[in-house]
């Protein structure tokens, strides 16, 4: 089970989706249960969930630990969009050690910390990148994400349209979204965009959504 989950939303005065955070560094450590044991991660000011594991990601990891996903072929590409310090990406990497996981974030401090966390936990199958650094021809078998809802509706829709289009024809995305921040309307929007979306769990105010491809 994830540990050190904060009881409130991250109150950072600077947006976690800023490309170059200027907030003074305030490192924190937290632990999560990976697929093969405990993982220890660092986070920092100016990065999403600067005090430890946030509620949404905690719910997501608990749900996905028990969810029966379709088999993924070794050598496939997987990704975490908006990786932050890397809790989701590192979990993916431990669950699918024969696949390559792209941990993607616009925030350079988040990318730096995610790289450190991957090295610290001896995970060599993670590539940390900005969105522009990911080859657009890559097709992903799986995407896991706690998407950056607070970037605004239009920007969020643009982000999801871009990345869902990079799913393989049999690919599946799993997202966690706060139900009070539009989870149900977002699910409807994705379904209408030819990405059939279903709710696989609802817990502690969050929805976990499964998104498939209809091409």
Show where each model-derived region lies:
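Class I S-adenosyl-L-methionine
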Residues: 12-26, 182-215
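Class I SAM-dependent methyltransferase Rossmann-like catalytic core
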Residues: 44-52
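Conserved SAM/SAH cofactor-binding pocket of Class I
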Residues: 55-136, 142-145
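Short beta->alpha hinge that forms the Motif I/post-I loop of the SAM-binding pocket
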Residues: 105-109, 155, 178
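A short SAM/SAH-binding and catalytic strip from SAM-dependent methyltransferases
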Residues: 141-154
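A short glycine-rich, Lys/Arg-flanked "PGG" loop and its adjoining helix->strand segment in the class I
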Residues: 157-169
């Amino acid at each position: 089970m994830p540990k050190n989950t904060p009881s409130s939303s991250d109150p950072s005065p600077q947006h976690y989706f800023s490309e170059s955070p200027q907030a003074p560094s305030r490192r924190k450590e937290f632990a999560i249960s990976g697929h093969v044991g405990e993982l220890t991660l660092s986070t920092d000011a100016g990065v999403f969930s600067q005090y430890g594991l946030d509620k949404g990601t905690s719910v997501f990891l608990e749900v996905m630990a028990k969810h029966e996903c379709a088999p993924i072929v070794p050598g496939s590409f997987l990704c975490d969009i908006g990786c932050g310090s890397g809790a989701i990406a590192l979990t993916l990497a431990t669950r699918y050690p024969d696949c390559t996981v792209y941990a993607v974030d616009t925030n350079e401090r988040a990318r730096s910390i995610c790289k450190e966390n991957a090295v610290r936990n001896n995970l060599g199958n993670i590539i940390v990148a900005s969105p522009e650094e990911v080859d657009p021809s890559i097709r992903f078998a799986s995407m896991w994400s706690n998407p950056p809802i607070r970037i605004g509706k239009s920007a969020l829709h643009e982000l999801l349209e871009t990345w869902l289009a990079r799913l393989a024809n049999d690919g599946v995305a799993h997202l966690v979204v706060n139900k009070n921040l539009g989870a149900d309307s977002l699910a409807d929007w994705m379904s209408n965009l030819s990405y059939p979306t279903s709710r696989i769990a609802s817990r502690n105010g969050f929805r976990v959504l499964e998104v498939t491809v209809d091409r």
